[in-house]
């Protein structure tokens, strides 16, 4: 593995930390801002090769997140040691999520995932599993200048919004679960996201979309 590979995984690791923090989990600025030298020192072998087992981490919801999303629970992030996710790899990951009572699991892999492995994901319900290819996390898409701010609403906020504007869920514009920002935030079916955009004429304005 070259130093370029280590650089790549360092970027992926930092974006994963940012993602977890943006979902409302307790991640320190020090973790998010880990330098490349620190990454090599803490996560790599003497030859500079990243040890993916060392990169795995768990996080707990922040007090603010628990207040807004009481059902949130802990999250586990795992970096797959195999290049591709097989049924065996996914089964072991599902067992780890279930046995340790994680509410959410994130599996980051290098190349691809077999359809059979993907079909195992619902087996951990009521826990949920999100999967990302390493290239998905090379950059944080939410920091792109053209991507507006997305904020996930709580159940209470959703109820208030629908009642205030006398709306039915079917009347709201939609955002697909496969949307890159929806995946980043971990949006689930039926959840609403508030999207804040800037306008040269009207300043900031908000719109809402429901995840399907």
From Swiss-Prot:
GO annotation, cellular component aspect: RNA polymerase I complex; RNA polymerase II, core complex; RNA polymerase III complex
Taxonomic classification: Eukaryota, Fungi, Dikarya, Ascomycota, Saccharomycotina
Main location, first listed in the record: nucleus
Subunit structure: Component of the RNA polymerase I (Pol I), RNA polymerase II (Pol II) and RNA polymerase III (Pol III) complexes consisting of at least 14, 12 and 17 subunits, respectively.
Name of the protein: DNA-directed RNA polymerases I, II, and III subunit RPABC1
Compartments it resides in: Nucleus
Similarity-based family: Belongs to the archaeal Rpo5/eukaryotic RPB5 RNA polymerase subunit family.
Pfam family, one: RNA_pol_Rpb5_N
PROSITE patterns reported in the protein's UniProt record: RNA_POL_H_23KD (PS01110)
Gene3D superfamilies in UniProt: RNA polymerase, Rpb5, N-terminal domain, RPB5-like RNA polymerase subunit
Gene: RPB5
Keywords for this protein: DNA-directed RNA polymerase, Nucleus, Transcription
One GO MF term attached to the UniProt entry: RNA-directed RNA polymerase activity
InterPro entries on file: Arch_Rpo5/euc_Rpb5, RNA_pol_Rpb5_N, RNA_pol_Rpb5_N_sf, RNA_pol_subH/Rpb5_C, RNA_pol_subH/Rpb5_CS, RPB5-like_sf
Gene Ontology biological process terms, A to Z: termination of RNA polymerase I transcription; termination of RNA polymerase III transcription; transcription by RNA polymerase II; transcription elongation by RNA polymerase I; transcription elongation by RNA polymerase II; transcription initiation at RNA polymerase I promoter; transcription initiation at RNA polymerase II promoter; transcription initiation at RNA polymerase III promoter
């Amino acid at each position: 593995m070259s130093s370029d590979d280590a650089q790549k995984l360092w970027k992926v690791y930092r974006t994963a930390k940012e993602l977890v923090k943006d979902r409302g989990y307790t991640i320190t600025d020090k973790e998010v801002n880990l330098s490349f030298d620190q990454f090599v020192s803490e996560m790599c072998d003497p030859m500079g090769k990243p040890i993916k087992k060392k990169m795995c981490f768990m996080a707990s919801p922040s007090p603010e997140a628990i207040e807004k999303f009481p059902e949130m629970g802990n999250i586990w992030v795992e970096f797959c040691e195999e290049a591709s996710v097989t049924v065996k790899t996914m089964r072991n990951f599902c067992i780890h999520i279930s046995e340790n009572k994680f509410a959410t699991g994130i599996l980051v892999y290098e190349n691809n995932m077999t359809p059979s492995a993907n079909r195992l994901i619902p087996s951990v319900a009521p826990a949920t599993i999100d999967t990302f290819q390493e290239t998905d996390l090379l950059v944080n898409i939410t920091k792109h200048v053209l991507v507006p701010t997305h904020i996930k609403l709580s159940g209470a906020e959703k109820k208030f919004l629908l009642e205030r504007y006398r709306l039915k869920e079917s009347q709201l514009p939609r955002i697909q679960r496969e949307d890159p920002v929806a995946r980043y935030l971990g949006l689930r079916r039926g959840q609403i996201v508030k999207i804040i955009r800037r306008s040269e004429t009207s300043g900031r304005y908000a719109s809402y979309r429901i995840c399907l």
